[in-house]
Amino acid sequence: MAKNTKLWGGRFEGTVEDWVERFGASISFDQKLAKFDVIGSLAHVQMLGQTGILSLEESEKIQVGLKELLEELEAGQLDFDIANEDIHMNMEVLLTEKIGPLAGKLHTARSRNDQVATDMHLYLKEQLGYVLDKLAHLKGVLLDLAENHVATIMPGYTHLQHAQPISFAHHLMAYYNMFQRDSERFEFNQKHTDLCPLGAAALAGTTFPIDRQLSSDLLEFKQPYTNSLDAVSDRDFILEFLSNASILMMHMSRFCEEMINWCSFEYQFITLSDTFTIGSSIMPQKKNPDMAELIRGKTGRVYGHLFGLLTVMKSLPLAYNKDLQEDKEGMFDTVETILNSLDVLAGMLSSLQVNKEKMQESTEKDFSNATELADYLAGKGLPFREAHEVVGRLVLDSIKSAKNLQDWTLEELQTYHSLITEDIYVYLQPKTAVQRRNSLGGTGFDQVEYQIAVAKKANEAKK
C-alpha cells in the first residue's frame, strides 16, 4: 500500500483517492486568504522567537522565507496544488521548498483551526474598511444631489399611490439615513472582527509558553479572544457581516426599484446615464436600467449567503468541524458584490438627470393636497375626523367631475364647509404644502436643509 504523503499523514496507511481529494480541497477559493495567511504566520513565528519557543535565528530564517513568499505572491508567481488541500498546507509546502525542514517548526503551538480563523479575521477587517469608505462616498453623492434639489417637488407615495407632495431632497435624505445606519452596523461589526484567534490552537490552547497578546499586537488586533473554544468554533463575525450586507443590499435594492420606476415612460422623473443602461437586441428604442436591476437581483444572492452560513452553523457542536470550510465562498462573494454595487449606485446617482418639471407636474394632477385641506379645516377648529370626512366627499365629487381641488370656485368649496375662505388656494399649492411641513424631520424646505447640514457635518467629521 502506498504511503500517505500528506503533512498530517503519519496516522494513515492508505492514500486519498483523487476525486475525494478534489471534493475536500478548498484551495480553489481559500487562496484569497494567502496574503493574510503569510501575515499571520509572520506574527506567529516572531512571537515564537521572542518567547524562546524557537531560537531567534530560527525565527529570523522562517521570517525571511515567509517574506519572500509574500513578494512572490504579490508578483503572481506562486502556484498552488490541490493535493495540498488548502492555503495553509500549500504555504507550508512552499516554505519548505524554500528553507527546508525548518519550515515545519512554524506550526509549533498552532493549529489550522486558529490559523484559518485568524486569516478570516484579518481579511474581513481589511474589507470592512473598504466597505465603509465606499459607503461614505455614496453618502457624499447623496448629499450633493439632495443639496441641489431641496426645492424640487415630487409626489410622496404610500401603497404606490400619490400621498402628499414632498421635497425630492427629503426623499434622498431618507436613503442617506438608511445608509448611515448601515455604516454604523459595519462599524460595530469591526469591533467583533478586531479580535485575535491566534494561539487558541486546535481548541484548548497550548502547553507552549506563547504570548497571545504579543501575537494580537503584531497583527494590530484590539485584543485576543478570551476563550480558545470560542475563538476557533464560531463564525458570528462573518454572520454579522452577511446580515449587515443583506440589510445594505435591501436598502440599495429599494432605491434601485424606485429609480427603475422613475426612469420609465410612465414616470419620466429621471434619466439615467448611458453608462448605466443597456439597449435591446431587438427593440432599437430601448434604454434599459440594467445596472439598477442587477443590484436589485444581486440582493437575493447576498441573502442566500447569509441563510447558507446560518444553516451551516445551526447544529455544529463545539469546536471545529469541517462544515466550517463552507464559511468562505459566501463571504468572499458578498464582499465583491456589495463593493461593486456601492460603486455602481454611486455612479448612477452622480450622473443621473432629474426632470424637475415632470416631478412638479405630477403633483398638480392628483389629490395629494387633500391632507392640506383637512389640516386647514382642523387648524380652524374643526375636529380632524370631521375635516377628513368633508374633504373625502369633496375628493369623490372631484373625481366624478374630473376636477382637481383647486379647480373649484370658492363658493362651491364653501358648500362643503363654511370655514373655507379665499386663502385656501395658497394652501392647496404643492409648494405651500411642502413648505409648511416644518416639524422635526419633515419635508419642509428649512427642515430638509437642516438635515443636509447636520449630515454633511457628520460626514466631514468621519474623514
Swiss-Prot record:
Its main location: cytoplasm. One of its GO terms (biological process) is arginine biosynthetic process via ornithine. GO terms for cellular component: cytosol. It holds the Pfam family Lyase_1. It is found in: Cytoplasm. Pathway: Amino-acid biosynthesis; L-arginine biosynthesis; L-arginine from L-ornithine and carbamoyl phosphate: step 3/3. Signal peptide: none annotated. PROSITE patterns: FUMARATE_LYASES. Keywords: Amino-acid biosynthesis, Arginine biosynthesis, Cytoplasm, Lyase. It comes from the Bacteria. One of its GO terms (molecular function) is argininosuccinate lyase activity. Belongs to the lyase 1 family. Argininosuccinate lyase subfamily. NCBIfam families: argH. This is Argininosuccinate lyase. It comes from Streptococcus pneumoniae (strain 70585).
